[in-house]
Amino acid sequence: MSGSPVKRQRMESALDQLKQFTTVVADTGDFNAIDEYKPQDATTNPSLILAAAQMPAYQELVEEAIAYGKKLGGPQEEQIKNAIDKLFVLFGAEILKKIPGRVSTEVDARLSFDKDAMVARAKRLIELYKEAGISKDRILIKLSSTWEGIQAGKELEEQHGIHCNMTLLFSFAQAVACAEAGVTLISPFVGRILDWHVANTDKKSYEPQEDPGVKSVTKIYNYYKKFGYKTIVMGASFRNTGEIKALAGCDFLTISPKLLGELLKDNTKLAPVLSIKAAQTSDLGKIHLDEKAFRWLHSEDQMAVEKLSDGIRKFAADAIKLERMLTERMFSAENGK
């Protein structure tokens, strides 16, 4: 009998090992794909909701959102907006039935440079969750990590007790500003940073530890832990399991079902790479960023400037596609009469 736990441990999947020192989050709108991996939390974005909303399995939710938009009435544009907010919340509510933790729901990326509009939309999403019987403690509102988005996050946290997840984070400047704003969680991207370096430099492949996305998250994690910031660091946007393993020990990692599946089948030994203890010995100095300093430092990072604007454009394009899809479903019959 005494040998069995050792044997069991030897066969433990990389996913189960990872869960021992990092909170694992599922990055998907397809909530039927969540069960197998037993994540703590889940994240969604406009692109993931758009993909899920086109699956046959989720048409009832789409119909419910459409009915809600129509019931509230008003101009066509208003009905669509209400239907989309409702759809995001319906997906979030279903996801919450399958996880013990929190779900992240994103504010429309087209509001990324309008602080007040982001605050208003976030409050509306929380209101819709409340109508569905879900406490704001189980929701993270995702906002773009523009200066305006970060200030919206600060206001939502301080004045409304709404927890925020700052997304599309590519630069150290963005991470520092988020820490100073006191938001609940940040999502520094890994894979999209790698994509940029592969596309814009001569180097086309990287070992995980040398991956520029991995190095970015490592630096941010070390900075937060060295200076005692409470904001959770959640690495996001992975291209392979090597990147994930190289960030083992990070507070949270949000991972697609495809890569969660690969980790589940992988039995290689995993050890934490990031740690609070190691962060204390890093040579990072503390900095303060007001708006001018933030804009300057962020603009110095060509990759981050390009990937932030590219990310906003992509999420905005998918929001528009979702609007068109709902417009067609809601009004094409009426318009055809």
UniProtKB/Swiss-Prot annotation:
Molecular function as annotated in GO: identical protein binding; transaldolase activity
EC number from the UniProt entry: 2.2.1.2
Pathway(s) of this molecule: Carbohydrate degradation; pentose phosphate pathway; D-glyceraldehyde 3-phosphate and beta-D-fructose 6-phosphate from D-ribose 5-phosphate and D-xylulose 5-phosphate (non-oxidative stage): step 2/3
EC category: transferase
UniProt entry tagged with the keyword Acetylation: yes
Record-annotated active site: 142 (schiff-base intermediate with substrate)
Described function: Catalyzes the rate-limiting step of the non-oxidative phase in the pentose phosphate pathway. Catalyzes the reversible conversion of sedheptulose-7-phosphate and D-glyceraldehyde 3-phosphate into erythrose-4-phosphate and beta-D-fructose 6-phosphate.
Protein name per the record: Transaldolase
Gene: TALDO1
